[in-house]
């Protein structure tokens, strides 16, 4: 009875005249000049997905294009092509440093440029740092700036450029614990950590130690001025208190029984802000309290708990509340936004959304100070022992990105502006002010790009466009095909492609990389004297599909006659029919095809088995054959991974078969 031989029956099948195997079945081909074995790449199907990122990507060039000409959506996008992408993602990127991606302060068309640096203003007149850590920074109505250091207050009347120690006519007996601007002057409170305390007032010309009648037994820990009221916090051995006071009545009383809020003494109030309908007070106990003015007095009218977190800063802008927290058990900082809503006559924060989390070993990344401008909210975050950054939330696009770099590491105790420039106080360090010199380098890192497919692509080229460069400014584009490279801006995996030192850019640089992903880092460098910045407009990358699918057409010998090398041919009745029926049974099945010459290993499916054809050659024997079509992908033989192992690679498989 004829049957189809298998690999278990035949050793070294190639030597015995077999040309290929399907799984474990062995077959002979019937190739000749008019019936060839053909291996070809399958046509790449058109994807029914619009992969253009922007309307500008409509082009006559072949391939798929990713581009960014607007980065105002902010950072944090790690993969550009995801199933749950939203419209905003077309303007987002992964990370940036030293560049302004929002362009909110200029009246020119959108572009990306370098940010200004900041400089140490040497408040104490020398290179010495502050002597304490409670370095509160405020700005009064006449644009003067003040910063505290232990019991000393320094004043700047020129927007923070120069500072002088003030000589008050009063004795500041204890360390300053908080300052609140009031007109051209300010109130401040002191405390010694026990029961010593003062409430003081500087009018802009005169100093006063306010009279305290009935007070709690403890010391002051903070002061704020909101809705024409002074909000004062204090701590005793049994509780932390929050009081209200009238700044126009110079007879102050802070009895424990008169506190608006009484909380656990292990925590303190950290920040207070006017949120419109109510005043919000943040506490390290993870609660945000809502204080409403009822017939002239503040009353607790709701509270919101942030589980397992300490709230250290809070500000409200355009009806949105922003607050910064620290995880209760780790130095992990988080930045949230929420909405103030009314529920059963109580004011609470709802729709809370985490915007950013900072996890850096051995660094307290708590957003410790906030500042609200016309279109943005800024918070400060320490990211290294010698680096603190302002992060900017841009209200028009809800984008969030790193902004100015402050020249020291530490918690920020105040952010303000002087003469149109940012001024910030770093605890235990100094005051830093924005300059008119650009950063020495800035970058934007794009998300990973894969055009919604896991297949390998042929990355053809990258293009960078910018304003004309005629001097020492420079824009470079680096690429990587490893998705994890975006986490490390200084990685050696970044490869330079575009390097623009003159002209407008716009030239596609060939990159010739085969990979699933591509990501890009665009680096901006200023003029030699740091007075000019390059103006970056857009970046794009183009890829061609790299089909891995192949189609193989094999003419299979289904004759009854068997021809073997160096052997006499024999005829086996019904052998051809048996072979043909075996092939028909494989139709539609997944198989592994191994061709012996040329050596190919393909895993796929038997797409079709054609009807038998009898070929009457002019010279030679009559051959009956059928054409088998297999569609699949090339695969590496698993044994090739072990070619260094004696008995498998050297002798057992590769050498002897």
Language-model features, listed with the residues they occupy:
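Leucine-centric amphipathic alpha-helical interface motifs
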Residues: 4, 10, 39, 66, ...
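Repeated scaffold domains used in trafficking and secretory/extracellular systems
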Residues: 126-140, 171-184, 214-228, 262-276, ...
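Short Trp-Ser/Thr-centered turn/loop motifs at beta-strand boundaries
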Residues: 127, 167, 211-213, 245, ...
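Blade-level signature of beta-propeller repeat domains, shared across WD40, Kelch, NHL, RCC1
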Residues: 409-448
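Beta-sandwich interaction modules
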Residues: 479-546
């Amino acid at each position: 009875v004829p049957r189809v031989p298998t690999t278990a029956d035949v050793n070294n099948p190639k030597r015995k005249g077999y040309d290929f195997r399907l799984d474990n079945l062995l077959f002979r081909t019937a190739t000749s000049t008019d019936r060839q074995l053909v291996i070809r790449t399958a046509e790449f199907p058109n994807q029914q997905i619009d992969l253009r990122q922007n309307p500008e990507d409509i082009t006559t060039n072949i391939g798929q294009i990713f581009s960014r000409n607007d980065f105002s959506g902010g950072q944090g996008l790690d993969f550009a092509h995801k199933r749950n992408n939203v419209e905003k993602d077309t303007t987002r990127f992964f990370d940036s440093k030293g560049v302004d991606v929002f362009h909110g302060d200029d009246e020119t068309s959108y572009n990306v440029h370098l940010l200004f640096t900041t400089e140490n203003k040497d408040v104490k007149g020398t290179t010495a740092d502050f002597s304490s850590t409670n370095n509160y920074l405020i700005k009064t109505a006449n644009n003067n700036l003040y910063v505290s250091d232990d019991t000393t207050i320094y004043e700047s009347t020129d927007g923070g450029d120069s500072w002088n120690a003030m000589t008050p006519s009063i004795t500041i007996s204890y360390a300053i614990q908080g300052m609140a601007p009031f007109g051209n002057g300010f109130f401040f409170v002191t405390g010694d950590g026990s029961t010593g305390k003062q409430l003081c007032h500087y009018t802009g010309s005169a100093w006063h130690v306010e009279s305290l009648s009935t007070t709690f037994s403890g010391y002051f820990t903070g002061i704020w001025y909101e809705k024409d009221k002074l909000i004062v916090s204090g701590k005793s051995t049994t509780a932390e208190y929050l009081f209200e006071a009238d700044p126009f009545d110079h007879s102050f009383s802070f009895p424990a029984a008169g506190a608006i809020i009484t909380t656990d003494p292990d925590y303190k109030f950290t920040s207070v802000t006017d949120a419109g309908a109510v005043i919000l007070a943040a506490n390290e106990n993870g609660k945000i309290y809502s204080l409403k003015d009822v017939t002239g007095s503040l009353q607790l009218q709701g509270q919101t708990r942030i589980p397992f977190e300490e709230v250290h800063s809070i500000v409200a802008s355009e009806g949105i509340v922003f607050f910064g927290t620290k995880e209760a058990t780790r130095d992990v900082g988080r930045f949230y936004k929420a909405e103030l809503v009314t529920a059963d006559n109580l004011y609470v924060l709802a729709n809370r959304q985490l915007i950013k989390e900072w996890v850096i070993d051995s660094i307290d990344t708590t957003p410790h100070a906030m500042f609200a401008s016309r279109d943005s909210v800024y918070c400060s975050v320490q990211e290294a022992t010698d680096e603190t950054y302002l992060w900017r939330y841009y209200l028009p696009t809800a984008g969030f990105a790193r902004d100015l770099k402050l020249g020291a590491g530490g918690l920020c105790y105040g952010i303000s502006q002087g003469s149109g420039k940012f001024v910030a106080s770093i605890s235990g360090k100094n005051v830093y002010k924005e300059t008119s010199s650009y950063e020495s380098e800035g970058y934007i890192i794009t998300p990973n790009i894969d055009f919604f497919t896991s297949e390998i692509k042929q990355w053809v080229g990258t293009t960078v466009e910018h304003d004309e460069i005629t001097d020492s400014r420079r824009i470079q584009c680096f690429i990587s095909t490893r998705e994890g490279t975006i986490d490390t801006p200084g990685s050696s995996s970044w490869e330079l492609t575009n390097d623009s030192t003159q002209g407008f850019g716009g030239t596609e640089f060939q990159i010739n990389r085969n990979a699933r992903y591509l990501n890009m880092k665009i680096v901006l460098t200023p003029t030699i004297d740091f007075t000019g910045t390059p103006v970056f407009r857009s970046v794009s990358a183009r890829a061609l599909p790299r089909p891995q699918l192949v189609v193989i057409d094999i003419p299979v010998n289904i004759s009854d006659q068997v021809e073997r090398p160096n052997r006499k041919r024999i005829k086996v009745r019904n052998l051809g029919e048996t072979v043909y029926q075996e092939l028909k049974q494989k139709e539609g099945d997944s198989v592994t095809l191994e061709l012996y010459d040329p050596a190919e290993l393909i895993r796929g499916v038997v797409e079709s088995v054609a009807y038998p054809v009898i070929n009457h050659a002019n010279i030679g024997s009559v051959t009956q054959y059928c054409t088998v079509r297999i569609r699949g992908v090339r695969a590496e033989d698993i044994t090739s991974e072990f070619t260094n192992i004696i008995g498998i690679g050297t002798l057992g498989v590769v050498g002897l078969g």
